């Protein structure tokens, strides 16, 4: 078969990398900013603002993964069985992944964790996108205010719920 007729077998690479284990999720839950609505909770940790604290022989795994793999952001999806059966859970995960792909520029340098609730299944893609953008912009605004406060000497605060 001629080379020009062969289909390209490689897929384009994803701009994100996924959170893999409990310790990575826990770091985002504990150190990140959180925002809740009736459909899902969003936890965001800004990895680009704070430099990784390195001890001897230890590197911060989240910050290193952004630099090493050339990923723009890290994504974690925590969809409980309470949300619905496997078909519903997978639909929600596909929608959330495509949302972050669509708005990858907004997510750059962040570690995001979505925790959908059972009402999330009944939202269509555009309503889900609207809620996601509202929550992400409010968290980013709050993070910028907190960063300015840290420069003035305030302590770290979390986003209000």
From Swiss-Prot:
It is an enzyme of class 3 (hydrolase). GO terms for cellular component: ribonuclease P complex. It comes from the Bacteria. Residues 1-20 are annotated as: Disordered. Coiled coil: none annotated. GO terms for molecular function: 3'-tRNA processing endoribonuclease activity; ribonuclease P activity; tRNA binding. GO terms for biological process: tRNA 5'-leader removal. Its EC number is 3.1.26.5. InterPro entries: Ribosomal_Su5_D2-typ_SF, Ribsml_uS5_D2-typ_fold_subgr, RNase_P, RNase_P_CS. The keyword Phosphoprotein does not apply. It catalyses: Endonucleolytic cleavage of RNA, removing 5'-extranucleotides from tRNA precursor. Keywords: Endonuclease, Hydrolase, Nuclease, RNA-binding, tRNA processing. Pfam families: Ribonuclease_P. Consists of a catalytic RNA component (M1 or rnpB) and a protein subunit. HAMAP family: RNase_P. Belongs to the RnpA family. RNaseP catalyzes the removal of the 5'-leader sequence from pre-tRNA to produce the mature 5'-terminus. It can also cleave other RNA substrates such as 4.5S RNA. The protein component plays an auxiliary but essential role in vivo by binding to the 5'-leader sequence and broadening the substrate specificity of the ribozyme. This is Ribonuclease P protein component. It comes from Helicobacter pylori (strain P12).
């Amino acid at each position: 078969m001629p080379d020009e007729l062969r289909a390209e077998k490689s897929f384009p690479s994803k701009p994100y990398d996924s959170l893999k284990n409990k310790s990575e999720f826990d770091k985002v839950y504990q150190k990140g900013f959180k925002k809740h609505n009736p459909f899902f909770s969003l936890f965001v940790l800004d990895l680009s603002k704070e430099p990784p604290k390195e001890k001897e022989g230890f590197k911060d795994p989240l910050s290193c993964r952004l630099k090493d793999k050339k990923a723009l952001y890290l994504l974690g999806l925590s969809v409980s069985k309470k949300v619905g059966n496997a078909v519903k859970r997978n639909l929600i995960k596909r929608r959330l992944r495509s949302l972050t792909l669509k708005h990858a520029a907004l997510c750059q340098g962040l570690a995001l964790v979505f925790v959908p609730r059972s009402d999330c299944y009944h939202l269509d893609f555009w309503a889900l996108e609207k809620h996601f953008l509202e929550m992400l912009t409010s968290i980013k605004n709050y993070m910028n205010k907190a960063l300015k406060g840290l420069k003035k000497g305030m302590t770290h605060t979390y986003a209000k719920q």
